[in-house]
Amino acid sequence: MSGARLRVVGAARLAPGQSQTFEFEQAAEPVPGFVLCHASAGLVAYLNRCPHWSVDLDLGDGRFYAEDIDRIYCKNHGALFRVEDGVCDHGPCLGQSLERCAVELEGDDAWVSLTRQS
């Protein structure tokens, strides 16, 4: 996925705790992801795939963040991920990470780079 960028319209207007999904096509296959606004981490973006079984985290409802525990969560397995780096700190994929995407702001929009970021 090197060099691919996608504009996520309006993502810079998200309030803390809100997310917006996006989908990129790579080799005619959908690559789903999400941008999340976090109170301290700002805008972060990850691919919508749990490292445990490579399934969507949100079960299709577009909600990824649990404010009461300050974690991104997988609704399939209950895995919890730190917002700032995507590392699982609870659940079946402990120590594994979500695939992070780079985010650049441009006005009210965000450009998401689907090149893997560490």
Predicted segments with their positions:
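N-terminal pre-ligand scaffold of iron-sulfur
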Residues: 1-67, 82-83, 97-118
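Short cysteine clusters
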Residues: 50, 74-77
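Short cysteine/histidine-rich metal-coordination sites, predominantly Zn2+-binding motifs
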Residues: 64-72, 88-96
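Short beta-strand His + acidic residue motifs that chelate non-heme Fe in jelly-roll/DSBH
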Residues: 81-82, 90
